Amino acid sequence: MQNYKFLKDINFPSDLRKLSENDLQEVSNEVRKEMIDAVSETGGHLGAGLGVVELTVALHYVFDTPNDRLIWDVGHQTYPHKILTGRKSKIKTLRQGNGLSGFTKRSESEYDPFGAAHSSTSISSALGMAEANKLSNKLNNIIAVIGDGAISAGMAYEAMNNAGASKTKMIVILNDNDMSIAKPVGAMRTYLAKLLTGKIYFSLRETFKLIVSAFSKRFSVKAGKAEDFLRSAVTGGTLFNSLGFYYVGPIDGHDLSTLIPILKNARDSKHQGPIMIHIKTQKGKGYSYAEKASDHYHGVSKFNVVTGEQVKSGTNLPAYTKVFANTLVKHAERDSKVVGVTAAMPGGTGMDIFAKDFPKRMFDVGIAEQHAVTFAAGLATEGYKPYVAIYSTFLQRAYDQVVHDVAIQSLPVRFIIDRAGLVGADGSTHAGSFDITYLSTLPNFIVMAPSDEAELVKMTNTSMTINNKPCAIRYPRGNGIGVELPSIDENIEIGKGRVIQEGKQVCILSIGTRLEECKIAAAELKNKGIESTIVDARFAKPLDQELILKCAREHEAMITVEEGSIGGFGSHVENLLSEKGIFDKGLKFRTMILPDIFIEQDSPKKMYDVAGLNASQISKKILDILFTKESIKVVKN
């Protein structure tokens, strides 16, 4: 840590509160420097945290955290919060194995009263805490901080609707930086822009600051006529007022001389109901490279602080995301019915590539996964070919729509599921562990998992031909293995796997990108005199029953390997073998799946070590099946 004037002596917010208000801007500057220094070494979310440094300092200065509950939506903006709440010495372990989480986490600190990583949960959880306090006759404050992107999601509207009718005091800080990950979209964004650019805001901005300063003592003591005047003068009627919120703003979120008295006023207010404080901030504030390109500095790899240059991956292998996007563009050039849908993640899913060539056929619906799925279903009813590109972890948020609006109606929506399996530094909140399970259980679904980038191209090609039911293609974060890519005319037969190599004793059924580990495991077994058949199953649904049953009858043992949880591919294979009476004939069988735990952040390789799904663990499992007395074996009568 640098030799800071103030930060060196701040370990907890109680230390911060000992300082004069006049010192807080320098504290903010030091926190900002420390954050930039840390993220330059660890990588992580940079821009969002830089934009809320002053807000973070002000909140911990004004409120009695952790007794007062401070809830951050999403949590990727909480690095300054972590620096000020007892985690300063560990800040350079962010997103590392056994290090600090990149998000808020209840088990990490009492200053994190609610864990986060997915968006739009803060107002709901804050309202729950506020109602609990009312029932318990507690007087502590509950504060939720939510961004302009996250507040556009349906869950946030549901929470505001409930909060406005509750007459329960809570404080919501709307952090408006005009940039969630990609630029926010939709009517809410337009509405907030009008609030920020209207004549009232600009003409009264300085006047507002002066009045707050003049009445600062009165503001800190009680709400009065000055507060009522400011509220009516600055806001007039707003959507938030209509929802039952006492709305103040918009105000400059980097101006501590304005923030602190307004937060004190909200803290001390006797208003019975929710209070909304709308602040305007700049994502990437204080670091010129992040200010100029805030979308590219949302999440960063390690970087040079002086030049802003990020460390490149050092590989020329194509990313799965880009392989899919480029393949879809080629199909869209041929077929005008191809359309893209994403939920506020065009860059992460590769749909920004599609949008450059087909802007009118690309729909970014914002942080609205439920809407995205049903919107795509509507497109499908009119003969279009919607591709919903979404992270596995975020598709979970729209499961009812997948079932009710897509699967039951057998609509040909194509789900392109990125970040399947274990994802590394973002940890358990972003892992794609469950999609094979929750999609393969649905009637009318086709579920595919490519073993490499060439297979991804073939599956994307094949999805173009599926016009009577939904399908899904799931693939991991990261790069392929360097195989040659096929043309867009090369399809695969639905429900048919492929044999990679043939042996006599054991059959390894792999689905997805664990195939390379299975090959290494088979080589290890060969050195021990054990011959293995390897099958790339390709499809979790429908299963290649003919191939699976043939392999089961011709081998002493069979093992399935997948990057998914219980109830997925292996469970469906086991059910097939049971129904066909294969176990009655003595087959030794095991499934290798993700364990029944949430695996914490680390490198993907280390996470798969924890999961028991790397090559040496696969070969050991097979040896156990073949040679231990405890192996599962159903003997003939």
Swiss-Prot record:
Pfam families registered for this protein in UniProt: DXP_synthase_N (PF13292), Transket_pyr (PF02779), Transketolase_C (PF02780)
Gene3D superfamilies membership: 3.40.50.920, 3.40.50.970
Cofactor note: Binds 1 Mg(2+) ion per subunit. Binds 1 thiamine pyrophosphate per subunit.
Coiled-coil residue windows: none
One GO term of the biological process aspect: terpenoid biosynthetic process
SMART domains named in the record: Transket_pyr
Cofactor requirement: Mg(2+); thiamine diphosphate
The enzyme's E.C. designation: 2.2.1.7
UniProt-annotated binding residues for Mg(2+): D148, N177
Keywords: Isoprene biosynthesis, Magnesium, Metal-binding, Thiamine biosynthesis, Thiamine pyrophosphate, Transferase
GO molecular function: 1-deoxy-D-xylulose-5-phosphate synthase activity; magnesium ion binding; thiamine pyrophosphate binding
Pathway recorded for this protein: Metabolic intermediate biosynthesis; 1-deoxy-D-xylulose 5-phosphate biosynthesis; 1-deoxy-D-xylulose 5-phosphate from D-glyceraldehyde 3-phosphate and pyruvate: step 1/1
UniProt-listed SUPFAM superfamilies: Thiamin diphosphate-binding fold (THDP-binding) (SSF52518), TK C-terminal domain-like (SSF52922)
Origin: domain of life: Bacteria
UniProt-annotated binding residues for thiamine diphosphate: H76, A117, H118, S119, G149, A150, N177, Y287, E369
Oligomer and partners: Homodimer.
PANTHER family given in the database record: 1-D-DEOXYXYLULOSE 5-PHOSPHATE SYNTHASE-RELATED (PTHR43322), 1-DEOXY-D-XYLULOSE-5-PHOSPHATE SYNTHASE, CHLOROPLASTIC (PTHR43322:SF5)
Family according to the record: Belongs to the transketolase family. DXPS subfamily.
HAMAP family assigned to the protein according to its UniProt record, in alphabetical order: DXP_synth (MF_00315)
Function per UniProt: Catalyzes the acyloin condensation reaction between C atoms 2 and 3 of pyruvate and glyceraldehyde 3-phosphate to yield 1-deoxy-D-xylulose-5-phosphate (DXP).
Name of the protein in question: 1-deoxy-D-xylulose-5-phosphate synthase
